[in-house]
């Protein structure tokens, strides 16, 4: 066997493992939050970025073996940004045989009119886009709206709200839409961004840049993202532990009177969640909670994944 053939086999092996991991992560999120039910029509919001492409690919994969029946319809919002390649998504989706709808709305013109030059337009653009997607979901008869936010997005939002908003508020894997009519789901909630990036590179998705509008990036979010990436590099397992913490909230040991009845504590009240452990020595695990090193972690970094199809 030649060296090139050996490398190709390793690439294929690692890509298969990567897809299985993403599939497992998505499957667990769907099960934990009851994201998809029998007969659901899922509107998959496709932006042309790595996250939404990966979400569509994994949902299509799960659809083939899921114990329930559900359908997918991909939706892209063409916001009339200069240079937007209108042909890319239709060609890609037609090749896959996926039902889709391209919604054309000149939100770019509205945003440029309302936001001063050089300012971040993402907030207004997001609000406009959200309203259009809700309307489209109604028109298509969709029961769920799937967005491509992943675990890193959720953690970034948590820290943004803590650092700048004074709230412990993240990005829920499942929620009711602002108009009270649609259920929004985030199937990639348990997926790592670096896994999604590797998968997108390997599959050679036709990525559409997200900066066509010319808007400046959200500086605060970028600072948080850089901080989390640095932590992940220097302290393996810290990201996993923080995400686990979001799933293990103890209201009695925080300070929110809306979540726990502190005023109701009187003599004779029972001990809740271990009582006062503030001055006790905590038993700190040797490894971060929720973290298991991937056996192929180094291999995935070393190998260039260029296999397009997973058998």
Swiss-Prot record:
Family matches, as Gene3D superfamilies: HUPs
Encoding gene (name): ttcA
Organism superkingdom: Bacteria
Subunit architecture: Homodimer.
Key word Glycoprotein present: no
Top EC class for this record: transferase
Function: Catalyzes the ATP-dependent 2-thiolation of cytidine in position 32 of tRNA, to form 2-thiocytidine (s(2)C32). The sulfur atoms are provided by the cysteine/cysteine desulfurase (IscS) system.
Keywords, sorted A to Z: 4Fe-4S, ATP-binding, Cytoplasm, Iron, Iron-sulfur, Magnesium, Metal-binding, Nucleotide-binding, RNA-binding, Transferase, tRNA processing, tRNA-binding
Main location: cytoplasm
GO biological process: tRNA thio-modification
CDD domains from the UniProt entry: TtcA-like
Residues annotated as binding [4Fe-4S] cluster: 122, 125, 213
Sequence motif PP-loop motif, location on chain: 47-52
Listed cofactors: Mg(2+); [4Fe-4S] cluster
A Pfam family of this chain: ATP_bind_3
InterPro entries tied to this protein: Rossmann-like_a/b/a_fold, TilS/TtcA_N, tRNA_Cyd_32_2_STrfase, tRNA_thiolation_TtcA_Ctu1
One GO cellular component term: cytoplasm
Keyword Nucleotidyltransferase: no
Identification of the protein by name: tRNA-cytidine(32) 2-sulfurtransferase
Family stated for the protein in its record: Belongs to the TtcA family.
CC cofactor note: Binds 1 [4Fe-4S] cluster per subunit. The cluster is chelated by three Cys residues, the fourth Fe has a free coordination site that may bind a sulfur atom transferred from the persulfide of IscS.
Transmembrane segment boundaries: none
